[in-house]
UniProtKB/Swiss-Prot annotation:
Belongs to the dynein light chain family. One of its GO terms (cellular component) is microtubule. It is found in: Cytoplasm, Cytoskeleton. Keywords: Cytoplasm, Cytoskeleton, Dynein, Microtubule, Motor protein. Tegument. GO terms for molecular function: dynein intermediate chain binding. This is Dynein light chain. It comes from Schistosoma mansoni (Blood fluke). It comes from the Eukaryota.
Amino acid sequence: MSERKAVIKNADMSEEMQEDAIHIAAGAIDKHDLEKDIAANIKKDFDRKYHPTWHCIVGRHFGSYVTHETHNFIYFYLDDRAFLLFKSG
């Protein structure tokens, strides 16, 4: 896995979970070419580790307005992609 710089734009989760999100996202980028597959990888890992139901959006151009559970939200950039990861439901 190459060294990447993450820029966290907004987060409502523990430092440990934030680091985990970035680490999992970096691994998903290395494994997958399609953004939908990257998002699915991150979502499944977070469902497994932090219990369902997580939602993940990955892309270069999108807007969002979501409701999330307290302490279960992060929005960050890694490389040239934005990542929105949150738990709801």
